[in-house]
Amino acid sequence: MKNFRDLSYINLKKNMILRSEALANLDINDQDLLLNKHNLKLVIDLRTPHGFETQKDMQLAGVKYVNIPLMTDDEIKSLEINDCYAKAVCEDKKDVWTKIFNLLLDNSDGAILFHCSSGKDRTGIVISLILSCLGINKEVIYQDYLLSNKSLKVPFKYKLRLLFASKEAKQNFYAYFWVQKAYLDSVFSEIDNLYGSINGFFIKCCGLNEDKIKRLKEKYLND
């Protein structure tokens, strides 16, 4: 299981918010880690229905699975990576963000794990904004986001191709295998443009208010 981490290393409570790649190829050690060490109870899959169906998560006993697509197939295929990131926080995504934060508010059983395909882009956006809501320092948020570059290894055959690739091909390669600070910058910039501030985003697009944000902090942050 690649790109896995428990966000407790950021001053969140242990076994509450996890992130990883898709859970299609879990070995026995992965299963034990999720169920017994981290008390996994809910998986939120951010992939499109197509991705959800073609590479299905391994079903673990006692775990609930919810598919909440952050982006559509058309958005992923047609938009540049920065535009795709920005699109994730547009006003037409209100239902998506409201569902995500309602599940966080309602959670009382154990850990919630967020993932997409590689656990770097869609998962990176969602985790970054959850951490923002919890009041985590922006520098720390970016550090966690960029940590995916260390967690995901590029297959050697692709490294060889990169030596002879065009500039455009190299840019596409980097976008596919790595995250960049500029991508996440696009999210926060679009939030400022559309909602005036990060708090405006939480109120207008996520269905949150001061009381709900306080409850989230009490539920997920260390005392």
Language model regions located:
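Cys-dependent protein tyrosine phosphatase-like superfamily
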Residues: 1-113, 126-223
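Ser/Thr-glycine-rich phosphate-binding loops at phosphate-binding pockets of nucleotides
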Residues: 118, 122-123
